[in-house]
Amino acid sequence: MPSARLTGLSGSQIALRDDDLALAFQNPAHLNSAMHNALTYNQNFLLGGIKSGYFGYGYHLDKIKITFQTGVQFITYGTFKQADELGNVNGEFKASEYAFTLGAGRQINERLSAGINLKYIASQLEAYRSTGLVADLSGAYWHEEKKFGAAVVFRNIGAQLSSYEGNGYTGKKEDLPLDIQIGFTKKLKKAPFRLSALLHDLNRWDMRYDNPLDNETSLLGEAPSEPSKLSQELNNFFRHLSVGGELIFGKTEVVRVRIGYSHQVRKELNISNVRSFSGFSLGVGFKVNRFRVDYGMGRQHLAGGTTHLSISTNFSEFRKK
């Protein structure tokens, strides 16, 4: 996730629309004039000392009514011991990946907008390197009076330019993880609460996998019962769904408290017969002077989870008297 706000909401809530530049990394159709001179920095602390982050800047050209963004997303895996096939350590190596983004979004009419993100991706694992060029295409609908939004994103349309195999550009190319997403968001009329939902990976409907634990016999030697067809279909459907909610304080949303849930994360990483918060996420955000600070925490497994910190501002605010 590019920001702590989205981490707290359990994922890429692509229908959300305001002046948060990090939202445009997930859906460039939300790029708007309020993001002119916006700056965002996001740091994600993952398991095993792995770190990732996103840095972005927005700029609006009023003459052509287009808002642009540029940014870089990174993930560093740390330092590894380098050993031969016999286990003899003969050095160290590092691994990291970067995605350089250039995006643009435009308002088509009062409620419809469209956008595109172009990304150059570079990966380095020891002496092996791979690059790719992808695009995210998106469209969005926003009804200001009803505070309702809907969006669709076609993510990772493109190709691998060079692979880890062979001589880079001549090696075998891999397929990119295409992801078609649909999202919705609604702020309640008489309550300071906003609900968001995302359907992801719609291009690969069956997201179930064979879990060997499902085939284990009980202590009494009884074979496990086969789930019904309806149960399997419902389980698969909810794996595509992630939901999040924001409790809002103040007219300018000075404070936001968040909660989210991902059924896919819970089903794939939760330990059977053990109670845990796998799949749940929490977050809080508040505005201090000209800065907005957000914190998000996602629980993936009993072994731990992720924490996310974001700081954003707008240079235009510093020019106001």
For the regions a language model picked out, list residue spans one by one.
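Subset of outer-membrane beta-barrel
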Residues: 1-321
